Every structure is written in structure tokens, then in C-alpha cells.
Amino acid sequence: MAIVQHLFGITMQNSANLEQRIAELEMKITFQEGIIEELNQALIEQQFVIDKMQLQMRHVANKLKDLQPANIATQAEETPPPHY
């Protein structure tokens, strides 16, 4: 033990401080893991909402296409007025 203390400069006080610092780091890691899990769940929920909204948007776009009369030319097909 004295050799280890001499080689690494570890004393009982230093050992207690290291143990305390390790315990604090373990608590911080545990807290961060919880936060990461919460963020992951929020991200999953947001992606679900985005997917649902994209599906709804495609549905609305298809309905608009169906409502558009076939006999009306698109803006690209229209000839410009004579004053152009």
C-alpha cells in the first residue's frame, strides 16, 4: 500500500475525494441518461406528428387536384395578353 501511495501519490484524503468525485460523475451520467431518453421519446413523438402531417398534406394536395377543373388551362399553358 505504501508503494502504491508513493508511486501514485494517493492518500486516504485523496482516495475519499476521488470516490466523491466518481460518485458525483455517476449521478451526473445517470441524470444525463434520463434526459437523453426523454429527448429521444420527444423526437419519436415529433417524427410521428411530422409523418402524419405529411400524409394529411398529400391528401389535401390530391383533393385540390381533383377539384381543379380539367377545362381550365394552367398558367404555363395560358398565352400572355397582347400588351406583353
Curated annotation (Swiss-Prot):
Pfam families registered for this protein in UniProt: SlyX (PF04102)
Coiled coil (residue ranges): none
Taxonomy, superkingdom: Bacteria
Family classification: Belongs to the SlyX family.
Protein name: Protein SlyX homolog
Organism: Mannheimia succiniciproducens (strain KCTC 0769BP / MBEL55E)
